[in-house]
Amino acid sequence: MRSRASAEGIAVLGLRRRGESPVCRRRNVVVCFWGDRSCVEREGCVRG
């Protein structure tokens, strides 16, 4: 689980550096894993 969580965390951190939320806009599954309810509700992301 650590390897998967770290991989997802790195992807999200890379996007957060820009100060944007492209993950939410693209309905990326990473949003569900990250636990950002605001993104999940707005984009209707399905939990994986």
Swiss-Prot record:
Gene Ontology terms: cellular component: plasma membrane
Keyword Methyltransferase part of the UniProt annotation: no
Maturation propeptide residues: 46-48
Cell membrane keyword on record: yes
Domain of life: Eukaryota
Record-level Gene Ontology MF annotations: pheromone activity
PTM-bearing positions, type Cysteine methyl ester: C45
Record localization: Cell membrane
Membrane topology field: Lipid-anchor
Keyword line: Cell membrane, Lipoprotein, Membrane, Methylation, Pheromone, Prenylation
S-farnesyl cysteine lipid attachment residues: C45
Signal peptide annotation: none
Coiled coil start-end: none
Primary location: membrane
Function: Activates B-regulated development.
Name this protein carries in UniProt: Mating-type pheromone BAP1(2)
